[in-house]
Every structure is written in C-alpha cells, then in structure tokens.
C-alpha cells in the first residue's frame, strides 16, 4: 500500500481562488476591500521570505496589503504605538506580527496588544480561549489549515485516536482543541513523553510539529493512519524535510502530507481566509 498524498498546494490554491472571487464580488457590490497589515522587525532571512510570500498572496486575492519593515533596534514602545494605530485604522482588518522577534522585544505583550478582532493569526489569548470554549472566532492558521486538509480526505474523524507530537502554542496546543472539536480522542506528546513510538503506533491520525527532522520513524506509523507533517527543516544540502521520515512512512500511511507542499501553503491561505472573515463578519 502507498499512501494517498494530501496536496496542500492545490487545496490552498483553490481556497485562494475562492477568496479572490469573494473579494471581487465585494468590489462589485461597492463594499470595502479587505486590508492586512504585515509587521516585520529585523532582517531574519526566513522571516523575510515568509513575509514576501504573504504579501504576494494578498496581491493575488486582491487584498490591500500594508507593509511595515522595521529595523532590529525598534523598541517595544514604538511597536506598541504602531499596533495601536493599526487597531484604530478602519481600513485594516488583520494585523500580522511576524515571529520570531528580536530578543529585546516581548512578543507575548505585543500579540496581546493586537485587537482580538484583528488577530488574524489567531494567537491572542481571547481567540485561543474561544477555541477552548468551543466557540471559535479567529482560529490559529496552521491548525485551521490542517483541519481543511483533513476534510479533503473524506475520512470521518469521529472516534479516531489522534496523537499530536509537539506542544507549542502555535500548533500543538490549539491543534489538540481543534481535534477535540472534531470528535477525536487526543493525546499530546512532548519532550518529556515516554515511549513516543508506542503512542504514534496506536494513532489513527498523527500530527507532527516538533521541529526535529526525522523524529518520527516510518515504521512507527500504524497501517492506514493519516500522517500530517508540520515540520519544515532545511538540511545541509539545502533539501527541505519534515519531522517524519517520509520515505518509510509512505508505504504504511493511508494519507500523508508531503514536505514541502503540504501544511505550509494552507497556513498562508488560512491567514487570508481569517482576514476575509474579519472584514465580512467582524468589521461590517
């Protein structure tokens, strides 16, 4: 058996097409164009690439994108004042603060400063709290994108044993809440977990987001399981690999995401989806 590939690139492209169509419909109806403000502090190469992709995505779907490229020495106060201005700007539906930030800045305080209705990354404690209470509003982009990928498989998630490897605030923890909402029995594994292989081997669905290349071995994967690999790691030869050993997982899994081309494109597409939602439902 060879796993079915979950083509995140194609699914994300279709989602962007739907968003672009809706933006055009709004334009024809005389409604305001959705706006996204993107804040980048410093010159981290990976962050610069991510931000450039997000800006291109905005252009593709017809959003108004505001770019704020700030020097590394930008102060906490200056960033706070910028966020306050964007919070008050009616043309801005979403505010994206690109992480990581330089060490002298307190990311938690800055993320909390973003108005919850403009928190299109879904990181604000208010939005995480709503997800925990089963009344999600703006949902974290990567878990939201993963749920869209899972829907594309047509598999019924109710009653599945789901294992998440990695307990970050960005992926692991909100992913657990999303899967609980979907009716799964959820186990979250982390650096202190004993017998990781055993947990993975019992999973009908495994989501790996640990940032460690090759952490999950293919032979651990249960026959027919769904494997979602969030990891994206660059090797010395420049090749991008995930947190799962893809070559050995492929013949065992029922469904699997490739790296690259799996989860990453969906994260970006869901940022756009959240921004459109904010414009249409929260900023009427």
UniProtKB/Swiss-Prot annotation:
Documented EC number(s): 1.5.1.5, 3.5.4.9
Protein's name according to its UniProt entry: Bifunctional protein FolD
Entry GO MF terms: methenyltetrahydrofolate cyclohydrolase activity; methylenetetrahydrofolate dehydrogenase (NADP+) activity
Residues annotated to bind NADP(+): 166-168, 232
InterPro entries found in the cross-reference section: Aminoacid_DH-like_N_sf, NAD(P)-bd_dom_sf, THF_DH/CycHdrlase, THF_DH/CycHdrlase_cat_dom, THF_DH/CycHdrlase_NAD-bd_dom
Subunit structure: Homodimer.
Source organism of the structure: Pseudomonas putida (strain W619)
Keywords per UniProt: Amino-acid biosynthesis, Histidine biosynthesis, Hydrolase, Methionine biosynthesis, Multifunctional enzyme, NADP, One-carbon metabolism, Oxidoreductase, Purine biosynthesis
CDD domains hit by this protein: NAD_bind_m-THF_DH_Cyclohyd
GO CC terms, sorted: cytosol
Name of the coding gene: folD
Function as written in the Swiss-Prot or TrEMBL entry: Catalyzes the oxidation of 5,10-methylenetetrahydrofolate to 5,10-methenyltetrahydrofolate and then the hydrolysis of 5,10-methenyltetrahydrofolate to 10-formyltetrahydrofolate.
GO BP of this protein: L-histidine biosynthetic process; methionine biosynthetic process; purine nucleotide biosynthetic process; tetrahydrofolate interconversion
PANTHER family from the UniProt entry: C-1-TETRAHYDROFOLATE SYNTHASE, CYTOPLASMIC, C-1-TETRAHYDROFOLATE SYNTHASE, CYTOPLASMIC-RELATED
Gene3D superfamilies: Leucine Dehydrogenase, chain A, domain 1, NAD(P)-binding Rossmann-like Domain
The family this protein is said to belong to: Belongs to the tetrahydrofolate dehydrogenase/cyclohydrolase family.
Annotated catalysed reactions: (6R)-5,10-methylene-5,6,7,8-tetrahydrofolate + NADP(+) = (6R)-5,10-methenyltetrahydrofolate + NADPH; (6R)-5,10-methenyltetrahydrofolate + H2O = (6R)-10-formyltetrahydrofolate + H(+)
This protein's pathway: One-carbon metabolism; tetrahydrofolate interconversion
């Amino acid at each position: 058996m060879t796993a079915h590939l979950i083509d995140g690139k194609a699914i994300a492209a279709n989602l962007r097409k739907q968003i672009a169509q809706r933006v055009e419909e709004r334009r024809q109806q005389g409604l305001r164009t959705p706006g996204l403000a993107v804040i980048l502090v410093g010159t981290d190469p990976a962050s610069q690439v991510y931000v450039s992709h997000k800006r291109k995505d905005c252009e593709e779907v017809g959003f108004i994108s505001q770019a704020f490229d700030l020097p590394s020495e930008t102060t906490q106060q200056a960033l706070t004042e910028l966020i306050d201005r964007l919070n008050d700007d009616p043309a801005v539906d979403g505010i994206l603060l690109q992480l990581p930030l330089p060490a002298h800045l307190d990311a938690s305080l800055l993320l909390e400063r973003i108005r919850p209705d403009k928190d299109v990354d879904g990181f604000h404690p208010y939005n995480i709290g709503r997800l925990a209470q089963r009344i999600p509003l703006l949902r974290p982009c990567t878990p939201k994108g993963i749920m869209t990928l899972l829907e594309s498989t047509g598999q019924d998630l109710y009653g599945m044993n789901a294992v998440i490897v990695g307990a970050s605030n960005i992926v692991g923890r909100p992913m657990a809440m999303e899967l609980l909402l979907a009716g799964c029995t959820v186990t979250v594994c982390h650096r202190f977990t004993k017998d990781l292989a055993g947990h993975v081997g019992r999973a009908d669905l495994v989501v790996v987001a640990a940032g460690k290349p090759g952490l999950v071995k293919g032979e651990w994967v249960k026959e027919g399981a769904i494997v979602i690999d969030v990891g994206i790691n660059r090797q010395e030869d420049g090749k991008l690999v995930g947190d799962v050993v893809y070559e050995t997982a492929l013949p065992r899994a029922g469904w699997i995401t490739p790296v690259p081309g799996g989860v990453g494109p969906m994260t970006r597409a869901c940022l756009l989806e959240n921004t459109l939602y904010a414009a249409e439902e929260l900023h009427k």
